[in-house]
């Protein structure tokens, strides 16, 4: 079988390439502009070419690949952003990825890429009175897709247009690994340009949980908040209870006591979504010593665990120097949960390998 290849736009810290490599797909090139993110990825994928700014690339003049992945900027689509949607300065870069895909397909007789994967925040389904997501579907398919009769986009769906077979699904990272990851709801859209395999890739059941065993330290695990079976050496049971900074500030600002109290969460809650703009604190104590606990922020390594990434994935750049904490937290807040990406890459490898 011919080797499957991948190109990653808006690459970030290389989560899609990592997921691809683990499923036998070779990352060939990436496009990213943040220096530390590029350096982190170069360390892990020294043979992957870095092409730079997407706005300066011609899809017809770069190496064709079987799969193109992209998590285009979400700032203008997010419900905590400025809500300018696909017209916003950053989120409009979505169309640059579509342009590159079309240029590549035009240059090689519509053979490559066979598959495209788009990832974004669920706010994209609400942005612009839900018309921005319609624009996304039309940009991929080239079809005049109607707005659903309900006026709302479902969390999962399929469309077949003249350009591609398309499926989307909202995945929440907390359900895709054991120990439990942070809460992270994201849209994953798969477009199949050479067949009708999008639904097979995105909806077919596959194993996703990893055997984690017992943790041997009292530091926050991927289960960040909650596990009664999280037992450290010495049999002490640590407890982690996350806070929601947004709710806490909102409750204080609006003098809403119930909102403020809900910000403290429950021991059974997953850790809140990691954001590039802020960290969520959490209370940490041992079950046999609640008074001896503390409130702290997760470490960079703990944030990597909450995203399902290998420990110290973001610690060093290509030159071996440590990446500063602020830039590591920002990169992780912008990243994709690895188990979700790996599930999709497994589906692509299976579908294209037939």
Where do the model's predicted regions map?
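C-terminal target-recognition/interaction regions appended to catalytic cores
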Residues: 229-354
């Amino acid at each position: 079988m011919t080797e499957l290849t991948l190109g990653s736009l808006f690459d970030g810290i290389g989560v899609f390439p990592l997921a691809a490599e683990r499923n036998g797909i070779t990352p060939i090139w990436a496009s990213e502009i943040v220096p530390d993110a590029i350096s982190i990825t170069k360390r892990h994928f020294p043979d992957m070419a870095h092409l730079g700014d997407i706005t300066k690339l011609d899809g017809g003049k770069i190496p064709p690949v079987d799969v193109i992945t992209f998590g285009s900027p979400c700032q203008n689509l997010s419900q905590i952003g400025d809500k300018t949607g696909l017209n916003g300065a950053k989120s409009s870069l979505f169309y640059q990825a579509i342009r590159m895909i079309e240029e590549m397909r035009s240059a090689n007789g519509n053979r490559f890429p066979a598959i495209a994967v788009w990832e974004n925040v669920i706010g994209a389904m609400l942005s612009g009175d839900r018309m921005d997501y319609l624009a996304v579907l039309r940009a991929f398919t080239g079809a005049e897709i109607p707005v659903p009769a309900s006026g709302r986009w479902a969390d999962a769906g399929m469309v077949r247009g003249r350009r591609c077979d398309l499926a989307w699904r909202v995945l929440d990272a907390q359900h895709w690994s054991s120990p439990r990851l942070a809460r992270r709801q994201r849209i994953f859209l798969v477009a199949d340009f050479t067949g009708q395999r999008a639904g097979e890739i995105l909806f077919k059941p596959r194993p996703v949980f990893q055997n984690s065993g017992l943790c041997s330290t009292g530091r926050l695990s991927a289960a960040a908040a909650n596990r009664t079976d999280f037992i450290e050496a010495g049999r002490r049971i640590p407890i982690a209870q996350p806070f929601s900074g947004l709710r806490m500030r909102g409750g204080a600002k609006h003098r809403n006591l119930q909102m403020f109290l809900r910000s403290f969460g429950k021991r059974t809650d997953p850790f809140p979504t990691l954001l590039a703009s802020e960290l969520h604190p959490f209370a940490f104590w041992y079950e046999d010593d609640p008074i001896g606990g503390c409130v702290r922020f997760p470490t960079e390594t703990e944030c990597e665990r909450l995203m399902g990434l290998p420990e110290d994935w973001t610690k060093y750049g290509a030159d071996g120097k440590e990446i500063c904490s602020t830039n590591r937290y920002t990169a992780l807040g912008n990243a994709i949960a690895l188990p979700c990406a790996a599930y999709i890459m497994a589906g692509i490898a299976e579908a294209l390998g037939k």
